[in-house]
Amino acid sequence: MKIKYMGHSAFIIEHKNRLIIDPYIETIPEVDYVLVTHAHNDHFGNTIEIAKKNNAKVISIYEIAEFVKQFNIESIGMNFGGTIDIGEKVSLVPAVHSSTLYYNGKAYPLGNPGGFVIKGNKTIYHAGDTMVFKDMELIGELFKIDVALLPIGGVFTMDIDQALKAIDLLKPKIVIPMHYNTWPIIKADPYEFKRKAEEKGVEAIVLNKDEEIDL
């Protein structure tokens, strides 16, 4: 599996399919599926444009999946505990946050926020926007996480210290920070996070925008 960081909380995961998660990006990459953790605009991003350009399916919580159908986009709605097999197994798990889309001057509350676990030859957990919560321990037990993508910017999500606690609960082999330094309000030092994570014996990788790793 390959992971490419697209900035903020956006990643492209490549295995049998090419998946993009939370596409708050300026480009329209070639993908097969668009995964949306929640409806906030810095995660929903240009989901509509990417899905239409690629004839890609949107995978998200049921309410978001239903919302995009008005744009003639195919979608797969899920809820917590659900798993689908698209060549990779995609599971929707909880997050502790909120989820409202602001679109064309209107506010659309669109279900609960979540995270995704994607299983190919490795297992990747994208936490979405969240604080640390005790059930991360259960997510780790159920899925045996190889790589955890964790927000560290604080204010709207967990900060570095909470993300370090999330490592204790999830027990991943590798962690990659996200959702930081996009704006001054979520300023954080990813290398502080890397140093402290590695003091726990967990490999931490700081990816620059457009940088890719092969697992």
From Swiss-Prot:
Keyword terms, alphabetized: Hydrolase
Family annotation (InterPro entries): Metallo-B-lactamas, RibonucZ/Hydroxyglut_hydro, UPF0173, UPF0173_UPF0282_UlaG_hydrolase
Residue intervals passing through the bilayer: none
An example molecular function term from Gene Ontology annotations: hydrolase activity
Top-level lineage group: Archaea
Gene3D superfamilies assigned: Ribonuclease Z/Hydroxyacylglutathione hydrolase-like
Record-stated family: Belongs to the UPF0173 family.
PANTHER family attached to this UniProt entry: UPF0173 METAL-DEPENDENT HYDROLASE MJ1163 (PTHR43546:SF3), UPF0173 METAL-DEPENDENT HYDROLASE MJ1163-RELATED (PTHR43546)
Name of the protein: UPF0173 metal-dependent hydrolase NEQ378
Species in which this protein is naturally found: Nanoarchaeum equitans (strain Kin4-M)
